[in-house]
Amino acid sequence: MLIIFIDADGCPVKDEIYKVAERYQLKVFVVANKYINIPANERVEMVVASSGFDAADDWIVEQAGPGDIVVTADILLAERCVKRQVRALGPKGVEFTEDSIGSAVATRELMQNLRHMGEMRGGPAPMDKKDRSRFLGKLDEIIQSLKRR
């Protein structure tokens, strides 16, 4: 059964995921280190992971399996998921695959080093309507491909 896991701390597309999951009648686990308000829906479940480092990520990796979807902006979590044949999707609609995850990890490390050296400040650009639209389209595409299996 296809399940969507949300790495929920700071995820900007939770509402969009809830709507898509409702349309397809899918189970959603909202995973975070602290309680987050979720819709009153029997298919949406809040999981508060322990407060340990990467506890939410670890829970997601342990629970998600092939045929599931993880929505995360955390590239290292996406890498762990891809290695387990779990579909990983970023909140801006970029799917992490076996072919793309290596360069995503390398880019993350480069940006982290540049920030550490003071060469760069700030983070990614804020979400806009195009990002949300791209995310919804890609999520729908992934769900359709998994349902055809």
From Swiss-Prot:
InterPro entries annotated for this entry? Answer: UPF0178 (IPR003791)
Give the record's family classification: Belongs to the UPF0178 family.
Taxonomic lineage from the root: Bacteria, Pseudomonadati, Bdellovibrionota, Bdellovibrionia, Bdellovibrionales
Q: Which Pfam families match?
A: DUF188
Name of the protein described by the UniProt record = UPF0178 protein Bd1212
Q: What's the domain of life for this entry? A: Bacteria
